[in-house]
Structures are given as structure tokens and as C-alpha cells.
Amino acid sequence: MFSISVVITIGGLPGSGTTTMARRLAEHYGLKHVYAGKIFREMAEERGMDLEEFSKVAEDNPDIDLEIDRRQREAAEEGDVILEGRLAAFVAAGELDHVKGPDLATLKIWLKAPLEVRAERVAKREGIDVEEARRRIQEREKSELKRYKEIYGVDPTDLSLYDLVLDTSRWSEDETFSILKAAIDPLLEREDP
């Protein structure tokens, strides 16, 4: 389909629009969508836990995160994929000790939005009040930051690895999609990006 193996990573904090954009881009370009959050949720469900409980378990069990990373790296090696997750860019770039290798990413994207906007989005999506959404987001982010620093020695809030950082609160969903498409299209037309 493409003249290159396409590996696009999309990261961002909860409620920033990563899943929405990853799904839309995967559908638009005919790419697989490998979603770290979905893998994590499935693992939580398998253990009969909600995300908060499982996040706490994951703090003491690095094998959970390492398994997610391995699955994402395998997908990156197969190519023609959108990898979604806070560490997806690190995984695709081969930056983590257990998934070392060449940088396979065609484009590394980070989506962001202010906490209040993200809390409103999560509240709407999950049918909870905004205050509860804010609390859950902050708890999850705290847990993840701790895990990522302890397990990998990386700070996922360091955005220097990303090619494109976009504040999704400034544009509508369709406008955000158009901006991302405008960044991706030229890369897919080139033989050697």
C-alpha cells in the first residue's frame, strides 16, 4: 500500500484525544491500531479489577508494562500500524532497554489538552461527573509517572522525542484530524522520509 513501512505513534494523557485520533487515522490510512490502553484494560478485566486497582498492582509488577511494550514493538516491526499509548513513541523508537532496536517510527505524535478539558471529555465518555473524572485522571497519571520512572527511567512528560505536539483543545475533532493528516500525508508520499 505504501512505499515505506508506516509506524505512527500517538501518545497523550487521558482525555487528550489519542484514541479518537488513532482510530480515525487507522481507518483513514488502512492501518492496524494497537492500543496500549486496551491491552492494559483487558489485563485488568482478566483479573477482575478496575483501572485504578490494576494501576496500583502494575506499580509493583513491571511485567505488566513490559508485556504491553513487547506487544507494541512486535506490531511496530510488522509495520503499517498506529501505536497508541503514552510510551508508544519510546517503544517504536527502540528507546527502552527491553525493546532496543532501530527507530521504526514514521511519525511520533503527542496530543495534549489542559486538565479541565480532559476531565470534561472523560466525564462525558464515562458518564461520571467532572470532579470524579479529574480525580481519576490525576490518580492514574500519578501512578503511571511513578511506574514509568521506576521501570524505565524515563519521564513520559518529556516531549523531546516527538515530531509533533498538538494541543487538541484548540481545534475541533475534525480540525485536529485534518492537522494530523496534513502532517502524515507528505511522509507517506516520500520514498525516503
Swiss-Prot record:
Binding site for ATP: 12-20
An MF annotation (GO) of this entry: ATP binding
Keyword Calcium: no
Ranges in a coiled coil: none
Example of a GO biological process term: pyrimidine nucleotide metabolic process
One Pfam family, short name: Cytidylate_kin2
Catalyses which reaction(s): CMP + ATP = CDP + ADP; dCMP + ATP = dCDP + ADP
Organism: Methanopyrus kandleri (strain AV19 / DSM 6324 / JCM 9639 / NBRC 100938)
The EC number(s) this enzyme carries: 2.7.4.25
Name of protein: Cytidylate kinase
A Gene Ontology term for the protein's cellular component: cytoplasm
InterPro entries for the chain: Cyt_kin_arch (IPR011892), Cytidylate_kinase_dom (IPR011994), P-loop_NTPase (IPR027417)
The gene coding this protein: cmk
Similarity comment: family membership: Belongs to the cytidylate kinase family. Type 2 subfamily.
Keywords, comma-separated and alphabetical: ATP-binding, Cytoplasm, Kinase, Nucleotide-binding, Transferase
Domain of life: Archaea
Subcellular location, record wording: Cytoplasm
Primary localization: cytoplasm
